[in-house]
Amino acid sequence: MTKTVFVLNGPNLNLLGKREPGIYGVATLDDIEASCKREAGQLELQIDFRQSNHEGDLVSWIQEAGEKNAYVLINPAAYSHTSVAIHDAIRSARVTVVEVHLSNIHAREAFRHHSHVSAVTKGVICGFGAEGYLLGLRALAAIAKEEENNGQSIKGA
């Protein structure tokens, strides 16, 4: 059975390739989406790739993923450090989530060291640039395979 992964991207990620390339790299969000689609095909996953600068959109999409029994690969961007709403959405949707960040948030400003989202995810990948998205998809594919082999759903953190 092919599993769907919602790849959700938070604020300012639409500016990738132009915004602080020394921190975030030169890949655009379109480049990352294309890479994710290629990787998903090899992993037998379907992806639904989305970006919004609005917290409520991300919350609604997480809820939608839960309703569709999909997985979530999320780069909440700055909302990692501020959004109790995204934390609560993940917890209430009981959806399997991997959090990804292009930069190593622990090697940056102190206010970026804490993520409200991390506590309700299966895992966090940070500091590997655009490759982090592919690592996240591989992790979710492994979880899907484990669920299929065990005949059960492994939800939440």
Swiss-Prot record:
One annotated GO molecular function: 3-dehydroquinate dehydratase activity
One GO BP annotation here? chorismate biosynthetic process
Give the matching Gene3D superfamilies: Dehydroquinase, class II
Specify whether Transcription regulation is a keyword of the entry.
Answer: no
Which InterPro entries does the entry link to? DHquinase_II, DHquinase_II_CS, DHquinase_II_sf
Question: Where does the record place the catalytic residues?
Answer: 24, 101
Similarity comment: Belongs to the type-II 3-dehydroquinase family.
Gene name of the record: aroQ
According to the UniProt record, what class of enzyme is this?
lyase
Q: How does it assemble?
A: Homododecamer.
Transition state stabilizer, annotated site positions: 19
> What residues does substrate bind to?
75, 81, 88, 102-103, 112
| Protein name per Swiss-Prot or TrEMBL | 3-dehydroquinate dehydratase
Q: What is the purpose of this protein?
A: Catalyzes a trans-dehydration via an enolate intermediate.
Keyword list, A-Z = Amino-acid biosynthesis, Aromatic amino acid biosynthesis, Lyase
Q: Which reaction does it catalyse?
A: 3-dehydroquinate = 3-dehydroshikimate + H2O
Annotated metabolic or biological route of this protein: Metabolic intermediate biosynthesis; chorismate biosynthesis; chorismate from D-erythrose 4-phosphate and phosphoenolpyruvate: step 3/7
Is Lyase there in the keyword field? yes
Task: List the EC numbers from the record.
Answer: 4.2.1.10
